[in-house]
Amino acid sequence: MTLIRGSRPRIKVLLAALVLTAGVGGTALVAPSPGTVAEQPAQDQRPAQDQQPSAAPKQSPAARAPKAASYPIGGYFVFASPSSSRNTQKLSEIKTAGADTVITFGTILAPATLATLPKECVIDGVNCAKAAAGNLEVNRYFTYSDGSVWSSQAVKCPQDRRITSQGKAFLVLVLPAQGTGCTSTNGKYDVVVAGGGAAGGMDPAASLALAATKLGMKFYAGLPLPVKRTDTAYLPDVSYQGTLTLFTERFLQYQAATNNVKGLAGFYHSTEMPVTDGHTFDPILDLYRMQNQAIHRILPTRGAIVSPYLDARVSAFSISLTEARKGIRRIAQTASGLVLNIAIQDGMGTGKGGAFQSNEANSAVDRYAESIVGKGSWSSKYVAPIRDYFLAAAAGISGTGAVLWANLEGMAPATASNPCGDSLRGQSSKARIDRQLQQLSNAQKIISFMWDSYYTCVGTGVPLKAQVESGIATPIITDATFDASTGQVRITGFNLSGGNAQVKWTTKAGQRLEKTVKPTSTNTAYGVQSGMNPELEMILVNVGKTTLAAGRYYTVNVTNQWGAENDAFYSQRVYTAQSSRDAKG
């Protein structure tokens, strides 16, 4: 996910949940269960642990209690502003959209020379880095241009300086090139010039943390990161790993001293890698491990987020489901004692992933994906749908202590029809976002890249944030099963409760039937009980004993207690008659 800079929302849109019915056994299966043999992509080697629960959890009084409508996206990437009022306004809007978490990207600790250091940073007319180092032997110079206003509490060593020059505030750190503390064991030092914010201004990260605290929200601050290698652009430059380690510790010590507020929930790793087990990316895993250890040592109650990316394109890197399962486990093993939230990017905004259902496998990709992968069907362009990758990831992360999140890409590949300001990506729509959400139900939290500016830009239609706010109560169906022998239909998703469900199906005799019925049971705690997204609900409806024709789809629509109908296309995998009998037994 590279940091680069519609249609009118509808509450009531008819959209079907299509599920291919099973044959002889009489039970239409949607979610896999142990022993089920389904049509799978060639690389799907998912073990039984990947499967979602098939039995309805036992209800409790609390599970039946009604709850307010909420959109499944629980957090957004944002830009921090030095203006406290702007940060508060932005977080208030995000909270109105149903989220409680914001994340910022980190700043690069970049190698520099005396000539490339900020011209405004001077002490008595002398370059501030040169003046701070004095007679010490300088190994390398660096910049950390975060635009912040570091306070005097960042000054720890005798040569460190906090200065105001030409209307800007800078911090100069003199770090040992070898060893720890303030004194180098080889007599050489690295000098870092940080900050550059307006003198007398507010530190953006501190302002955002205070706003989050005031609003009862969570803020994850971006960690320092290295530059990329010049020969291999997808790997970090580890030639100054020691300097980055020392600077990370000083950065975290400063956060502990000045920004240790309730709203600061943890930190974000901005260096990215694919969800794969390839050892090529070991330097990135080493970086995660180093910074996680530092967080846990200095701020032991804080967690971290890392957001690896998918690439399911057949014509590209093509991460397999097995690689994703093993890859997330390797990332989880870098946690080093803290709570590590692994938010996999779904790839829909960059065209690297496909949110499609089984009955769409042979259908043409949408125009946004087509702009990246070309014309063709979903199954010919992508190894597997996003949902399969998250099932594999859930199996891989199991038992590690890390938490599976999802990073929903809130933009779309750019075309002539969906400009988003001056961004290189295009504006998406809530209907497309809802399709993505259907694939992510087993992630315990869903965050999205990014509020600024993909949710706020004025493109060809209504800004995405307005679409989300007006459609916050929309039901989103994530799964359904139909047991024809009892007539019970089990539906899971978001914002399902309090209304009714419409079921359409074809019997073995070829008769088309339709019923609209109220739920016989509602479990608003289904997600919590199942270890999936805590906002997930489950409803049971009964249409009476019947039969289901083999090879035919049944449809399910939900109207909830707010009168809203699902507005995202839904279907599931193709199952054989034999698989139905096996699973039923």
Region locations from a protein language model:
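N-terminal carbohydrate-binding accessory modules
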Residues: 39, 61-98
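Aromatic-lined carbohydrate-binding surfaces of glycoside hydrolases
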Residues: 81-87, 94-279, 310-318, 346-357, ...
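Substrate-binding cleft of secreted/luminal carbohydrate-active enzymes
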Residues: 83, 90, 94-114, 144, ...
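Ser/Thr/Pro-rich low-complexity tracts
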Residues: 497-507, 513-585
